Amino acid sequence: DVLPGSLSNMPIFWKPNELTWLEGSYLLVQIEERKCAIQNDFKAIVDAWPAFKRICTLDEFSWARMCVCSRNFGIVINGVRTSAMVPYADMLNHFRPRETKWTFDNTRGAFTITALQSIPSGGQIYDSYGQKCNHRFLLNYGFAVEDNYECDGYCPNEVALLVRLAPEDPLTAR
């Protein structure tokens, strides 16, 4: 078993009292949207193949979907872009700037991870999950980066802002 039994660090699996920590944030909307998308996919599969419901519950399906979401690698195999689950490669923690690169080596028929710099013996090997804002890290991977800054000082964190116009505002007509 190389996949986690629980994904309780991911907010779509949080209890209602834990979700109160996110009150007022756009992340709550994204969590609900993700739950709805997973429920709709589950329903579509069950509608097409009713026996699926006897094999897999919505909770199990949600767990599997989030395992894929948090652990798949985009790769190119023989010129075809695809995604792959790569056991143990998904155990690398996130760090920026990037210290490794990964690819599918067609000549070896293997997924490879290459260090981009010297890593001391016994040192942790990191992967970069990309330049993302903390709400994406939390939604998709179950963690946030304390000082989420790039080397150039850029901070990819985003803040969603809802702006409502009064019905009589001329911009409303546009």
Where are these regions (language model features)?
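Long, positively charged leader/targeting segments at protein N-termini
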Residues: 1-174
